[in-house]
Amino acid sequence: MSEIRRILLDDKVEVVERFGDLLKTEDGRKVLIENAVHLPPCEPTKIIAIHLNYDSRTKEFLTKLPLAPTYFHKPITALNSHNGDVVRPKRCKWLNYEGEIVIVIGKTCKDISIADAHKYIAGYSIGNDFGLHDFRDTDAGSMLRVKGADSLAPVGPGLVTDWDFHNKFIRTYVNGVLKQEDNTKNMEWDMHYLVADIARTITLSPGDIIFSGTPANSRPVNIGDVVEVEVEGLGRLTNRIVEGHSIREEVGAQPTESEEVVSTALGGDWEFRGIRTPSKDLYPSTVKERNDHN
């Protein structure tokens, strides 16, 4: 296996290879990892993510996996890097981490078999599919603002080639405390299946990335929290939560705190209980209403 990273060095983008605690450029320059300014390890034209894949996640929501994977799209502007700041806007409070393994496409592919999918994968990285659930009442179907806001797709620190994804652990930590833990053997659809499935109808280009799903226990984070995702053989992706500007109030849907929002953010069973997005005319907060009656 080898690990390739992209860093900013002397105001230029450099592709470097990792050797222990050092990163080495093609012309022989060396940089300590701790001093490197990391960029995302690839330059995708598409960021695609699966909704559900781990058995623990479906059990947490008291739901069942669909018969086949379902996906959503994250804008390129959501892309972030190792040690990058993840922004939670003012007036928002339900920003969740979701530690994941990321597939990086190496060659253009379309309409390929599962057996051939590995030929089109450049390697693997670590991702954190952050979700701003304050907008779930508005964009639950498309996930556009829930998962697509700027900075909500950290990937890194590097791209590892020839990594065997079978029976590997994945863990997420917040401020050093373990929050998520699972194993790739508990994924319903493996990496090769996901690539072949998407490529049936969508051309995948070099650098494109696919988030492969998160296990149970995705939870909200607070300003100042440090979130780390660790994957066996891939390393550790680190990000800090910072506060952004306030969401404009004179235009568009506003952050909400409905029971669906809170239940999703806290790993609840809103779908099992038949709760649906509240009226788009009122966007009532059933959580607030319930608290007012207590």
Task: Identify the role of each PLM range.
Residues 2-93, 97, 256, 262, ...:
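Extended, compositionally biased flexible segments
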Residues 6, 47-50, 101-105, 123-126, ...:
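Short hydrophobic-aromatic micro-motifs
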Residues 19, 57, 133-294:
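Catalytic-pocket segment enriched in acidic/His residues
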Residues 49, 96-98, 205, 222-223:
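Residue-level recognition of short, solvent-exposed, well-ordered loop/turn junctions
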Residues 98-128:
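RNA pseudouridine synthases
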